[in-house]
UniProtKB/Swiss-Prot annotation:
Binding site for Mg(2+): 246, 289, 316
Official protein name in the record: Enolase
Top-rank EC class of the record's enzyme: lyase
SUPFAM superfamilies reported for this sequence: Enolase C-terminal domain-like, Enolase N-terminal domain-like
Free-text cofactor note: Binds a second Mg(2+) ion via substrate during catalysis.
MF terms (GO), sorted A to Z: magnesium ion binding; phosphopyruvate hydratase activity
Chain residues that bind (2R)-2-phosphoglycerate: 167, 341, 370-371, 392
The species this protein was found in: Saccharophagus degradans (strain 2-40 / ATCC 43961 / DSM 17024)
Length: 428
C-alpha cells in the first residue's frame, strides 16, 4: 500500500489567462502526481460548481484561492495516510466532506485536481502509464482503442469573437489506418482551410480552441469552406473526412425560440430540428452535439426521432457527465451519446461511472477538453483507457490543445496494435 504523505493546491493559469487549480499528491515513497482542473465557457446549468473567489480586485473576481485553501486546509488532512490506489475511496472522502449535490463547498475544481493528481501518483507508483492505471480502476485492463479526433477547425459561439452562431465545426479523419495518420490528415486540412479563408479575404486568427474564427454570412458557409479545404488537401469529404457540429444551442435559446442572430434567423424547436436534419442530409455530418437546449427535452425528443438513427446526437449541457441525468435520458430515449468532461461532475470515479453507464446502454461516449485548458493531458489517457473511441481536444494549434494530441501519439507508439483505431465504426 502506497500512502499519501501530502496534498498541495496551487493557483495557476489556464489557456484563457484565467486562474485555475493545480494539485500535487505526494506519496511517502516520494512519487508526485500533478493535475490541473480545466474551465468551460459555455457551461450547463447543472454542472458541478467551479469555485471562484469573486474578489474583483484579483483577476476580475476569477481567482481560485478559496479552492486552493480547501485543498490545503480541508482535503489534505482527510487524505494523508490513505492508500493512493484506492481511487473511489479517495473520491468518496472528498465528496462526503463537500456534502453538496454540486460540490459547492469545496469546489469541483479543487476536488477534481486532487482526484486526477492521485490517479497520476498511483500510476507512477505502480510503474505503469496513466491509461493502464485508469483501465485497471475501470475494470477494463488491456481493452484499449485509439480515439477518432473530432478536430474543431472553425470556432464560433462562446469560443470566438465573431458572428457565427454554431460553436464548433469539426472534422474527423475516419478513413485513417491509425491515430498518427488521422492527426496528419487533420493537420493538412487545417492548413488547407487557412489558405481557403485567406483567399476569401477572411480573418485567420484562432479562437479559444485553436480553430479559425472568421465572420461568415451563415453557419452553412463554414461547412462550405471546410468542404473546399478538404478537397484542396486531397481528401474526399464523406469518405475519408467527415463532419461534426457542436451547436451549443443553450447559448442562443430564449423563450422557446432558437435565435441564430448571426444569420438573422429564428426557429421553433421543430423548425430547428428540421434545419439540423437538412444540414445533415446535405453534408456528411456524423455527429451533432447539443442540438437542442439543455432544458428543451421535447425538442431533444423530436431531434432524436428525426435523425437519431443516422446521426450521433451528443448531450453535453444536456447530461453534464452526470449519471442521474444520463439515466433519465436513456430511459426516455433522448440523444444517443454523451460528452464526457471531468470538471462537469468533478471526480475521476464519477466520470468513469458516466462512461460505463453510457456504454452499457449503447450510447457512445465522447471524451472532451474544455475551452479553458492547461498543459494537462489526462483526457488523452482517459480516452484510450476506456476505449471511448472519440476525443474532442480542439484544433491543430495552441499548445494546450496539441499537448493532448502529442500524448496520444506517444500512447499509440507504446501500444501499437493493442490499441486499434476504428475510424467510422466508432460512430453508431
Amino acid at each position: 500500500m502506497s500512502k499519501i504523505a501530502n496534498v498541495i493546491g496551487f493557483e495557476v493559469m489556464d489557456s484563457r489567462g484565467n486562474p485555475t487549480v493545480m494539485a500535487e499528491v505526494v506519496l511517502e515513497s516520494g512519487v508526485v502526481g500533478t493535475a490541473c482542473a480545466p474551465s468551460g465557457a459555455s457551461t450547463g446549468s447543472r454542472e458541478a460548481l467551479e469555485l471562484r473567489d469573486g474578489d474583483k480586485s484579483r483577476y476580475l473576481g476569477k481567482g481560485v484561492l478559496k479552492a486552493v485553501a480547501n485543498i490545503n486546509e480541508t482535503i489534505k488532512p482527510l487524505l494523508v495516510g490513505k492508500d493512493v490506489a484506492a481511487q473511489r475511496e479517495l473520491d468518496d472522502i472528498m465528496l462526503k466532506a463537500d456534502g453538496t449535490e454540486n460540490k459547492a463547498n469545496l469546489g469541483a475544481n479543487a476536488i477534481l485536481a486532487v482526484s486526477l493528481a492521485a490517479a497520476k501518483a498511483a500510476a507512477q507508483d505502480k510503474g505503469i502509464p496513466l491509461y493502464a492505471h485508469i483501465a485497471d480502476i475501470n475494470g477494463t485492463p488491456g481493452k484499449y482503442t485509439m480515439p477518432v479526433p473530432m478536430m474543431n477547425i472553425i470556432n464560433g459561439g462562446e469560443h470566438a469573437d465573431n458572428n457565427v452562431d454554431i460553436q464548433e465545426f469539426m472534422i474527423q479523419p475516419v478513413s485513417a489506418p491509425n491515430f498518427t495518420e488521422a492527426l496528419r490528415m487533420g493537420a493538412e486540412v487545417f492548413h488547407s482551410l487557412k489558405k481557403v479563408l485567406a483567399g476569401r479575404g477572411l480573418n485567420t486568427a484562432v479562437g479559444d480552441e485553436g480553430g479559425f474564427a472568421p465572420n461568415l454570412p451563415s453557419n452553412e458557409a463554414a461547412l462550405e469552406a471546410i468542404a473546399e479545404a478538404v478537397a484542396a488537401a486531397g481528401y474526399k469529404l464523406g469518405e475519408e473526412i467527415t463532419l461534426a457540429l457542436d451547436c451549443a444551442s443553450s447559448e442562443f435559446y430564449k423563450d422557446g425560440v432558437y435565435d441564430m442572430s448571426g444569420e438573422g434567423k429564428k426557429f421553433s424547436p421543430e423548425e430547428f430540428a428540421d434545419y439540423l436534419a437538412e444540414l445533415a442530409s446535405k453534408y456528411p455530418i456524423l455527429s451533432i452535439e447539443d442540438g437542442m437546449d439543455e432544458s428543451d427535452w421535447d425538442g431533444w425528443k423530436v431531434l432524436t426521432e428525426k435523425i437519431g438513427s443516422t446521426c450521433q446526437l451528443v448531450g453535453d449541457d444536456l447530461f453534464v457527465t452526470n449519471t442521474k441525468i444520463l439515466k433519465e435520458g436513456i430511459d426516455k430515449s433522448i440523444a444517443n451519446s454523451i460528452l464526457i468532461k471531468f470538471n462537469q461532475i468533478g471526480s475521476l470515479s464519477e466520470t468513469l461511472d458516466a462512461i460505463k453507464m453510457a456504454q452499457e446502454a449503447g450510447y457512445t461516449a465522447v471524451i472532451s477538453h474544455r475551452s479553458g485548458e492547461t498543459e494537462d493531458t489526462t483526457i488523452a489517457d482517459l480516452a484510450v483507457a476506456t476505449a471511448a473511441g472519440q476525443i474532442k481536444t480542439g484544433s491543430l494549434s495552441r499548445s494546450d490543445r496539441v499537448a493532448k494530441y502529442n500524448r496520444l501519439l506517444r500512447i499509440e507508439a507504446e501500444l501499437g496494435e493493442k490499441a486499434p483505431y476504428r475510424g467510422r465504426a466508432e460512430f453508431k
